[in-house]
């Protein structure tokens, strides 16, 4: 931390998934006047991301080793972040995988791996974070669900089911945190054009990581608990929920 600064006076933003395009776009917007902690595997190879955030005005940028799938390490990881940087003001859960749907339909281990990263690991981190922030009496958590989890489609049901589970867990946790001083914001993006979806045909009403980040920061500033990106997807998926199953099962990704 910058010489002379009190760690308790400077807000700390924890980005879990330190290489995530969306996560980094959010961190860039939150960087001015704050400390940023990037958590990722191979954390020693994040110099480009560190420099980007310093250029954006971060007071300090540090990295920590984070393996989302190693759930038994999550408690110690978060405890170490608090010990070194003080209170976590904002935590952004930006880790996850799409997986290969075709492979997951016949390879049980791959299906389990997708669900473990996209649901089980998130549940672990969220439970630890909620306990820490309850103790602080303040804090904000950003969780990424997806429209894929609002009504699961045949075309991506493994990933979609993990997001459906996460959406339900985060919704319940948000209610449990009501009145605690902790804000949980559940973000439901549609198709996001970026490295994670490279080579895939963009779906209608797609967004960029920058557009998602703008919506997230607006939501954090306004105290929102649900953010759809783009907003039009909320009424669209209200209608989608009502489609007969015979039509729904033929829906593309």
Q: Which residue ranges define each predicted feature?
A:
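Conserved mid-core segment of classical short-chain dehydrogenase/reductases
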Residues: 96-112, 155
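Rossmann-fold cofactor-recognition segment
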Residues: 53-72
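C-terminal helical subdomain
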Residues: 186, 201-238
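Residue(s) in the substrate-gating loop at a strand-loop-helix junction
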Residues: 146
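Conserved glycine-rich Rossmann-like NAD(P)H-binding loop of the short-chain dehydrogenase/reductase
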Residues: 33-48
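Active-site helix of classical SDR
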Residues: 126, 162
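Conserved glycine-rich cofactor-binding loop
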Residues: 19-21
């Amino acid at each position: 931390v910058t010489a002379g600064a009190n760690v308790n006076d400077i807000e700390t933003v924890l980005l879990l998934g330190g290489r995530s395009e969306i996560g980094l776009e959010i961190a860039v917007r939150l960087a001015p006047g704050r400390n940023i902690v990037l958590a990722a595997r191979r954390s020693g190879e994040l110099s480009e991301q560190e420099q980007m955030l310093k250029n954006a005005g971060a007071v300090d940028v540090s990295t920590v080793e984070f393996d989302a799938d190693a759930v038994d390490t999550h408690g110690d990881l978060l405890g170490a972040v608090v010990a070194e940087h003080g209170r976590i003001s904002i935590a952004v859960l930006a880790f996850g995988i799409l997986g290969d749907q075709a492979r997951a339909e016949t390879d049980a281990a791959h299906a389990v791996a997708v669900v473990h990263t996209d649901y089980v690991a998130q549940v672990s981190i969220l439970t630890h974070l909620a306990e820490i922030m309850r103790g602080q009496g303040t804090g904000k958590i950003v969780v990424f669900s997806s429209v894929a989890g609002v009504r699961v489609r045949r075309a991506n049901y493994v990933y979609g089911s993990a997001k459906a589970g996460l959406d339900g867990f985060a919704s319940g946790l948000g209610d449990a945190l009501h009145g605690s001083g902790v804000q949980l914001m559940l973000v439901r993006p549609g198709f996001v054009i970026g490295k994670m979806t490279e080579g895939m045909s963009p779906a209608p009403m797609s967004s960029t990581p920058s557009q998602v980040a703008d919506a997230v920061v607006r939501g954090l500033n306004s105290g929102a608990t649900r953010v759809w990106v783009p907003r039009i997807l909320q009424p669209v998926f209200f209608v989608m929920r009502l489609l007969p199953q015979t039509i729904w099962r033929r829906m593309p990704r």
